[in-house]
Structure formats: C-alpha cells, structure tokens
A protein has these predicted regions:
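A conserved beta-strand element that flanks and buttresses the S-adenosyl-L-methionine
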Residues: 62
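Short amphipathic alpha-helix with an adjacent loop that forms part of the alpha/beta core around
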Residues: 50-56
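Short alpha-helix
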Residues: 118-132
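A short glycine-rich, Lys/Arg-flanked "PGG" loop and its adjoining helix->strand segment in the class I
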Residues: 76-88
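Short catalytic micro-motifs in class I SAM-dependent methyltransferases
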Residues: 65-66
Length: 199
C-alpha cells in the first residue's frame, strides 16, 4: 500500500492494523512531521519523484487531499505513473473534500483559501473523469464532534494543507476568530469525494 500525502501516517497506520497487512505501508509527504507513525515506512519526498524511481508495485495507492497541490499536467503524469505501478486488480483511490458541500469550521482567511482550493479541485476532478471514463465515484459523510480546544490544536499544527502557507500571525489571528465564532463543542459533517481508478 502506498499513501501519497500521508501527513503523519496515522490514517494509513490504523488501516494497516485493521486489515492486518503483510507489509508496512509506505507513506509519502513533502512535510517531515515530527510525530510520524512508527507503523509506516515514511519517505520525505514528492510523489512524482518516488513513483518514477520505485521498482515496487502496489495493490492500493491512496491519494488523500493532495491532488490540489499539483498542476494539471502533474496530475496526468502522476496518475498515469501510478496506474503503471498497480498490481493486477490494484486500485488508485483519490480522496478529497467535497468541493460543493463543505462544512469545515474555518476562520475568514482559511475559508477564502479553502474555497479557492476546492474550486480548483472541482476542475481537477473533471479532468480525471475525462481521462478515466470508467472511474467509480463515491461520496462519504462523516459526522464530526470535536472540542474547540482540540480543534484549535489541530489548526496550530496546520492539520489541513490549506493552512501550510499561513504565517504565525495569520494562524494566531485565525485562532482568535475560531475562539469567538464557535461554541465549546464543534459539530459538523465532513464530506468526502472518493474517485476510484481500477487497473
């Protein structure tokens, strides 16, 4: 299993434990997080470089909320290269926030940037659907309940790629907004789009 944009590797590590995988999943991320999961083989590299060099093939290649960080040409290259690295019956699964229905709690600047990012995601999905007409599309809705204190910590750690380019002052100002805008407990629906490309 290969996880592109694995972050700290917690999701793929949990999946690995639940599915009792024979091999440790490989996680790629351009951010070298300190608190990475020990249950994955972490590589601090970009996907295009890794895929073009690796001799490994995979049953599953997971691309989570990362596609918007690439240019259209890079997406075409990445998906084509990923498809060539799939085992028989292998799958590429692209997970991203639903670009049309999004309830993530945000501060003003975060919302503005997220909206721009999701708009771009929609154009990317259209491109992927055009290039892979047999693609399977699924939607998932997760009910999220989280304390405001915990959510503030997540924002401080820049849990979503939209926050990565923000400076310390922008984050600090945003946290003041979050503190004033939301109740002690945040409840929202996390809506994900899942695109599945089969080998």
């Amino acid at each position: 299993v290969l996880d592109i944009g694995c972050g700290r590797g917690k999701i793929i590590a949990n999946l690995s434990s639940k599915l009792n995988l024979h091999y440790k999943p490989i996680g790629l991320d351009i951010e070298n997080h300190k608190d990475k999961s020990k249950k994955i083989i972490f590589k601090n590299t970009d996907a295009l470089s890794f895929i073009s060099k690796t001799k490994l093939n995979f049953d599953l290649i997971l691309i989570k909320q990362t596609i918007h960080l690439l240019k259209k040409k890079e997406i075409k290259t990445l998906l084509s290269n990923c498809k060539s690295k799939l085992n028989v019956n292998g799958k590429i699964i692209i997970l991203s926030l639903d670009p049309e229905k999004n309830e993530i709690p945000t501060f003003f600047l975060m919302k503005k940037k997220l909206h721009k990012s999701l708009k771009r995601d929609k154009s990317y999905f259209d491109l992927i659907k055009k290039n892979y007409p047999k693609i399977i599309i699924k939607q998932f809705i997760f009910k999220v309940k989280i304390s405001k204190i915990k959510y503030i910590q997540m924002i401080k750690k820049r849990y979503i790629s939209t926050l990565l380019s923000f400076n310390e002052k922008q984050i600090a100002d945003g946290l003041i907004e979050i503190k004033n805008k939301y109740k002690k407990e945040l409840k929202f629906k996390d809506r994900l789009i899942c695109l599945i490309i089969r080998n």
